[in-house]
From Swiss-Prot:
Family: Belongs to the bacterial ribosomal protein bL9 family.
Keywords: Ribonucleoprotein, Ribosomal protein, RNA-binding, rRNA-binding
Organism of provenance: Thermosipho melanesiensis (strain DSM 12029 / CIP 104789 / BI429)
GN (gene name): rplI
InterPro entries the record matches: Ribosomal_bL9, Ribosomal_bL9/RNase_H1_N, Ribosomal_bL9_bac/chp, Ribosomal_bL9_C, Ribosomal_bL9_C_sf, Ribosomal_bL9_N, Ribosomal_bL9_N_sf
Source organism superkingdom: Bacteria
GO cellular component, one term: ribonucleoprotein complex
Protein name as it appears in the record: Large ribosomal subunit protein bL9
GO molecular function: rRNA binding; structural constituent of ribosome
Gene Ontology process terms (BP): translation
């Protein structure tokens, strides 16, 4: 019997796949437990419509993220921090601090997990910081770390 898997099933397949299994296994285990549906033309048509809808949503999210990144790139994010005379920071600037600066300057709430730092920033200066948004959208924003009280 052909079935459409509704969830990942070990040793059978992943969600959305169409698999051939024995009639007894399908009727007595997969279908009653809600792990699969019989692959009728109606079910296949519905599955295809759901796939199309998910693809359209992915494209829409990617477009929105590209627009967001384009907008974020327009700003220079100046972050005042406490630092010594040599330019070394007291502490370090993390992705969380940069996310707060983006929210304050660009008025966009961005999760800190989307800001990628190879290592925490520990000195005053200009930095290109990678922003990696969902759906493979990524780019760099300019961050200037300045000493508190100086412009």
């Amino acid at each position: 019997m052909k079935v459409v898997l509704l969830k990942d099933v070990s040793k059978i397949g992943k969600k959305g796949e169409i698999k051939n299994v024995s009639d007894g296994y399908a009727r007595n285990y997969l279908i009653p437990k809600g792990l699969a549906l019989e692959a009728t033309p109606r079910v296949l048509k519905r599955l295809e419509a759901e796939k199309r809808k998910k693809e359209e949503e992915k494209i829409q999210i990617k477009t929105q993220n590209e627009e967001l990144l384009k907008m974020l790139k327009k700003f220079l994010y100046k972050i005042p921090v406490k630092a010594g005379e040599s330019g070394k920071l007291f502490g370090a600037l993390t992705n969380s601090d940069i996310a707060k600066a983006v929210e304050k300057i660009a008025d966009v709430n961005i999760d800190k997990k989307f800001i990628v730092l190879e290592k925490p920033i520990k000195e005053i200066g200009m930095y290109d910081v990678l922003v990696r948004l969902p759906e493979g959208v990524s780019g760099k924003i300019k961050v200037e770390v300045i000493q508190e009280g100086k412009n």
